[in-house]
Amino acid sequence: MPYIMVVQMELVATSGGSLPWFSGSESRGAFLSIVGQACEELAKTLHSGGRSLYALKPLNFKSGYRVVGGKGRSLAEAGVLFERGARAVLEVSLFDDEVSRRFISNVLPVATGLTVKGISFRVDALAAHLVDPLKVIEGSRDWEGGALDVHFHTPTYFNPLTGDQRYKILYPEPLHLLASLTASAHALTGVDLPKPSELAECIYISGLSIRTPRMEA
C-alpha cells in the first residue's frame, strides 16, 4: 500500500510581479518544469494520462502581497500583486512510492528555484512528511456525523458516471463527489468502501454557493 508523500517548497520572489489569484496551470507548468530539468523520465510519468500520481496546491502567498480586483465578484477574476522578497508556498502530494523515491532523490537536491509565468522564485526551505491513507480512513470511523463544509478553492468539475464523457459535471452533486473520493481512497488503500450511491443516500446539501468568472461578450 503506498504512502502519500507531501512536499512543501517555501519560495521567495526574486523580483516583484503579478499573477492570477488562481495560478493552477502556471504552478503545474512550473512544477513539471523543475521535475523535467532534473529527471525527464519522471516528468513524462507525471504528465502521462491515466490515474493521477500527484496533486498540486497552487502557489499560495504568505507575505509581501495584496489581492487586487475580484471585489464583489468571483475571486477567479482577481490577481495578486507581490513585491520582491514576497514569500509563498507550493505543495505537492505524491501518490506512488516509486515516484516519491525518485522525486526525493533526483529532484529535491537540485531544486534551487522555479519560474512561474516568467517570474523567478528561489527555494528558501523544503519540508516533507508521509501520510498513511489507511490511518486517515480508520480515524474517520469514529466521526459521529453531522454537518461538513466542503470548499473548492480551485475550479473543479466531475466526470459523468454514465453517458457522454465529454460533458462534465460542474455542480458538486453528492453522488459524483463521493464516487471520486471513494475511487481515490480505494486506489490508495485497497479498502472496500460502501458504494457511492449508498453514501449519497445519507447526505443532502443544505447550502451552496457557486461563483464563476465573468464572461465577456
Predicted feature descriptions by range:
Residues 1-217:
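RNA-interacting cores
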